[in-house]
């Protein structure tokens, strides 16, 4: 492998913004935010919207979007359905 062309692989903390669940993993992505982990070390903090703690496949709870789509708005506007 060529030297100097591969990104640095380091440990980071991922935080689910919906539930507050945090887990330590490896990643090449960095962050300016840091957090102190359970082992006393400080790691970069990466915020994610969905993780295994909040995804319906893993939790068994179905979550429906409340936003109306274009078709729904059209039907409401013209009194269809």
Curated annotation (Swiss-Prot):
Family matches, as SUPFAM superfamilies: L28p-like (SSF143800)
Biological-process GO terms, alphabetical: translation
UniProtKB keywords: Ribonucleoprotein, Ribosomal protein
Gene3D superfamilies documented for this protein: Ribosomal protein L31
GO cellular component terms, A-Z: ribonucleoprotein complex; ribosome
Any one GO MF annotation of this record: structural constituent of ribosome
Domain of life: Bacteria
UniProt-listed Pfam families: Ribosomal_L31 (PF01197)
Subunit structure: Part of the 50S ribosomal subunit.
PANTHER family assigned to the protein according to its UniProt record, in alphabetical order: 50S RIBOSOMAL PROTEIN L31, CHLOROPLASTIC, LARGE RIBOSOMAL SUBUNIT PROTEIN BL31C
Family the UniProt entry places it in: Belongs to the bacterial ribosomal protein bL31 family. Type B subfamily.
The protein's name: Large ribosomal subunit protein bL31B
Gene: rpmE2
